């Protein structure tokens, strides 16, 4: 925080009302091209399960970024890893540049092959989206950033669309977007929106899996890489999963051990909804009225 004295974090520069970034690569998560501190284009994946903008540890060293120490982070399956703290002067997102951006560092390059690109140098998390009216438009393959103003929201709401569903959300901690949903025929429960859950549409806490009568497919278990290390992943299928008034059937789920945030926030969190649940939709995050729109 001391490094931002006299400066405005997340200071936006650029013309126009919208900046668009096309998705690249063929992997399971959206990847966009950005520039850090005015350098060459690099590939970042998008993960609303993450908080701050993140840079690969080696990439941060190559850029000569300051090191403000480390904290312990908790990741999938309850894995722990040290997370570095730093900052960048500029992050260029399409036509816009954001100045004075706090960042965290982790060894993200190890995820490159699984994300279908030559090299991943970082990640865009939920905290950056706070400063925009942001849309992950999966059908059209692009990230759309609009200015966070009443006028932008009014223009968005006035756009013609087919089926559009608004789901109220709350924030837990600094980046956990939580809303009401249902698992199978269980009573309504709170679920975490994690578009960075690759290869699945759900990751449920073990008690919910058991209560819903969901069967783990142990014979199809495999190893996968997470930010905290390598995990044993066991697939399963959720016959019915809903978020607000959106319901999907036969949603692929992933079990990789204890769900570490089930009882962290003073309320019960039944699990998370991942990329496969949201990919049929354009998903807009409105942090002014605290709603997610699915179109």
For the regions a protein language model found, what residue spans apply to each?
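Pepsin/retropepsin-fold aspartyl endopeptidases
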Residues: 1-295
């Amino acid at each position: 925080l001391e490094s931002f004295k006299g400066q405005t974090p997340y200071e936006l520069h650029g013309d126009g009302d919208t900046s668009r970034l096309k998705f690249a690569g063929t992997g399971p998560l959206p990847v966009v091209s950005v520039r850090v501190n005015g350098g060459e284009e690099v590939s970042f994946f998008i993960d609303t399960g993450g908080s701050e903008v993140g840079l690969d540890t080696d990439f941060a060293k190559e850029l000569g970024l300051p090191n403000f120490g480390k904290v312990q982070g908790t990741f999938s399956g309850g894995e722990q890893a040290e997370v570095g703290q730093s900052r960048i002067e500029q992050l260029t997102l399409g036509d816009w540049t954001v100045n004075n951006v706090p960042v965290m560092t982790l060894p993200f390059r190890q995820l490159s092959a699984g994300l279908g690109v030559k090299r991943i140098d970082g990640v865009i998390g939920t905290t950056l989206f706070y400063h925009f009216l942001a849309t992950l438009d999966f059908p059209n393959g692009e990230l759309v950033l609009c200015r966070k103003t009443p006028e932008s929201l009014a223009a968005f709401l006035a756009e013609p669309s087919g089926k559009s569903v608004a789901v109220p959300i709350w924030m837990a901690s600094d980046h956990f977007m939580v809303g009401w949903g249902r698992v199978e025929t269980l009573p309504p429960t709170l679920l975490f929106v994690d578009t960075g859950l690759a290869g699945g549409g759900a990751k449920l806490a073990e008690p919910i899996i058991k209560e819903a009568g969901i069967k783990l497919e142990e014979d199809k278990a495999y190893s996968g890489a997470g930010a905290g290390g390598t995990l044993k992943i066991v697939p399963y299928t959720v016959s019915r999963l809903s978020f607000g008034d959106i319901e999907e059937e036969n949603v692929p789920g992933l079990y990789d051990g204890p769900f570490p945030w089930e009882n962290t926030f003073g309320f019960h969190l039944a699990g998370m909804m991942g990329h496969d649940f949201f990919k049929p939709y354009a998903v807009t995050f409105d942090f002014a009225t605290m709603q997610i729109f699915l179109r």
